[in-house]
Every structure is written in C-alpha cells, then in structure tokens.
Swiss-Prot record:
EC number, as in UniProt: 2.1.1.-
Role played: Sterol 24-C-methyltransferase; part of the third module of ergosterol biosynthesis pathway that includes the late steps of the pathway. The third module or late pathway involves the ergosterol synthesis itself through consecutive reactions that mainly occur in the endoplasmic reticulum (ER) membrane. Firstly, the squalene synthase ERG9 catalyzes the condensation of 2 farnesyl pyrophosphate moieties to form squalene, which is the precursor of all steroids.
Record family assignment: Belongs to the class I-like SAM-binding methyltransferase superfamily. Erg6/SMT family.
Protein name: Sterol 24-C-methyltransferase ERG6A
GO biological-process terms attached to the record: ergosterol biosynthetic process; methylation
Coiled coil stretches, renumbered: none
UniProt enzyme class: transferase
Entries under Pfam families matching the protein: Methyltransf_11 (PF08241), Sterol_MT_C (PF08498)
Length: 381
C-alpha cells in the first residue's frame, strides 16, 4: 500500500523536473568536482532557478517579514528546496565536500575524518547492521549513504527531490563500486512512493529541516518504517533560547533559512513534539552541539585558522575565511561579467555566505543547533 499521510502538498511532476535538469545541468553530473561542474550549466535555466528561488527572499527583511510570507514559502517547499540545490550543489562540493552536513570535532581530528565519524555515530545509535534495508531521507549527493553502507554493510536507498543530486550520487556510487549496495530515488519526502512498512531503519542527516512541517515528514517516515524499526535524525532546530520577539534572533533565523533553502525552521520543543505526535516512541534525544568538545561545530564556517588540525584541512578551511570568500565571490562576479560563469553564481555564493555568518552567530549564541539528535522507534505490531 502506498498512501502518503500528508495532504495539501505540491503536486509532483517528474517529467518537468527532468526536463529542467537537462536544460540547466546537461551532462555536468559526470564532472569530476564542483568547480568543473559549475561552468557547464545552461544559462537561461540557471537564471530561471535564481529568479524562482530568490523571489521568496529579495526585499523581505526580518523586521518586515509577515506570517503570509512564511506560509508562501511553506506552500512551495518542494520547489524552494529543489531550486536551492540546483544553485548550491556545486558550491557545496567545492567548499565542503560530498557530505553536506556539520559534525563534532575532537582535538587533532582531520576534517573529513570528523565528518565520517558523525555519520558512523548516527548509524551506531540507530543500530544499522549488515543486510538491513535502510532509507536515507534527503540523501544529497550520497556522501553519508556511501560511508554508512561501507561502515555497516546495509543496503541503502537514498531519496532526493533534486534530479541533479540524484545523478551525482549515482555517479559517485558507481565510481566507488557501490552500485549494488546503493540506489537513489527521485521523490518528495513528504509523499514517498514506497509502500508501508518498507524499511528496517531510516535516517536523515540535516535534511528534514526542508519539510514544511516536521510532523508531516516524521509521519511519512513512520509510515514507510517497519514495525519495531528505528528512525534517527540530526535535525536543524532553533533552540528554546530563541525569542521570536527579538529582531536579532529573527535575523539570524531568516539568514539561515534564506542561505540554506529552508521554508520554516522550528524550535527544539516543536521537534520533540513532532516525533511523539507522529506515533514514535522516543528512545533518546540530545543536542550534540552542547557536548563539551574541544572545538565548536561551526569553526570551519567561522574560518578560524587557529582550529586547523592538519595541513590538508588548511586548504579546505581557508576558502571559508572572510578573505577567502571575498576572493572567491569576486572571481565569480568577474567570470559572470565575461560570461564565463552562468548568471546568478555570485548571488548564490553571497546567499551561502549570509547563511554561514548567521549559522556561526546562531551557534555562538546558542540559538541554533544543526545536530539535535533524536532516535525513535515505531512500535512493534
């Protein structure tokens, strides 16, 4: 039985999305990395994506934001997210890697080792084992799915609403010889095409924040999870220190939402309530950002070179410093001027920079967490 528990959602149109993907991205999904792919876009399609995405944000500052504007973004959550990743995926790969998430850091731990450990920790908390059938909700270009597949031996299905990311994920899985252990499916996670009780376990890493409501996405995950199965999530949430009457707090939240394709970010208390209201039994919940780690989770975005752990990390993090971003964004603007880069590249990069600044501010002031861990079980039948 396939019957989404949600109603009033955007209508899916896979042919439309496939046609747009071809027009904008062409064969760039086969490119070696983010920079190489960035310059192989269809200009008219990219401009359409820029216009469609930024219509929700341009000239709409936090002090004047209305409930109607937030509701409009929620109503178009799928289009908002799809076009965000049409614009941002190559920049993510260039600046961060193929696992689009934050992590905790130990002293002396290289950046990419810390990223992998964060993925392993979630798999361990859920209890993912060899031979399990597992769903990755909002899989990006498949970095976490590949790592968890290798770590556990499970078969992982990645679900994603962006054709380009699906193509990138499939390409990388083939290159690593993991095609038999991984598959990637195009679809809206609010209305999944999978039958009820399909998966032994489900996880989501910083992806369900794109849902219009957390109860809606968690209810859909509950539906496709087998009775007795476990769901684990690293959720993006405003902490309960967030005060919506405080303009600075609202500016931080809106900056994160705009720069990260989010229609409506909730507070921790709302996230916990959504798990319970969806029918799950909560096994564990904790803000991992509150752990007394030697290095803060946001240090790479802050561009604080004093935290660099290895020589290799220096070349990753230097791009995130203020002057590193200034040079990169200036170059993007120059390339646009000479029509060597598609229009909208610099505007997208500037929006990501706004998000980075607001993420750091939210982290430092304990207003935001990208790693609120919730592990919950669907009751056995």
């Amino acid at each position: 039985m396939v019957a989404s528990s949600n109603t009033g959602l955007e209508r899916e149109d896979h042919q439309r999305d496939a046609d747009f993907n071809k027009a904008m991205h062409g064969s760039s999904a086969q490119a070696r990395g983010g920079v190489a792919a960035m310059f192989r876009k269809g200009g008219a399609a990219k401009q359409a994506a820029v216009d469609e995405y930024f219509k929700h944000w341009d000239n709409k500052p936090a002090e004047n934001e209305t409930p109607e504007e937030r509701a409009a973004r929620q109503a178009e959550y799928a289009t908002l997210t799809r076009h965000y990743y049409n614009l941002a995926t190559d920049l993510y790969e260039y600046g961060w890697g193929q696992s689009f998430h934050f992590c905790r850091f130990s002293q002396g731990e290289p950046f990419y080792q810390a990223i992998a450990r964060h993925e392993h920790y979630l798999a361990h908390q859920i209890g993912i084992k060899d031979g399990m059938k597992v769903l990755d909700v909002g899989c990006g270009v498949g970095g976490p799915a590949r790592e968890i597949a290798k770590f556990t031996g499970a078969h992982i299905t990645g679900l994603n609403n962006n054709n380009y990311q699906i193509e990138r994920a499939t390409h990388y899985a083939f290159k690593e010889g993991l095609s038999n252990q991984l598959e990637f499916v195009k679809g809206d996670f609010m209305q999944m095409s999978f039958p009820d009780n399909s998966f032994d376990a489900v996880y989501a890493i910083e992806a369900t924040v794109h849902a219009p409501t957390l109860k809606g996405i968690y209810s859909e995950i509950f539906r496709v999870l087998k009775p007795g199965g476990v769901f684990g999530v690293y959720e993006w949430l405003m902490t309960d220190e967030y005060d919506n009457d405080n303009l600075r707090h609202r500016e931080i939240r809106l900056g994160i939402e705009q720069g990260d394709g989010i229609s409506n970010m909730c507070k921790v208390s709302e996230g916990i309530a959504a798990i319970h209201d969806s029918g799950f039994e909560m096994l564990h919940h904790e803000d991992l950002a509150d752990r007394p780690d030697a290095l803060p989770w946001y240090w790479p975005l802050a561009g604080e070179l004093r935290y660099v752990q290895t020589v290799g990390d220096f070349f990753t993090i230097v791009r995130m410093t203020t002057w590193g971003r200034t040079i990169a964004h200036g170059l993007a603007g120059l390339l646009e001027t000479f029509k060597l880069a598609p229009a909208g590249t610099k505007k997208t990069a500037d929006s990501l920079a706004l998000a980075a600044d607001c993420l750091v501010a939210g982290g430092r002031d304990k207003l935001f967490t990208p790693m609120y861990l919730m592990v919950a079980r669907k009751p056995a039948a």
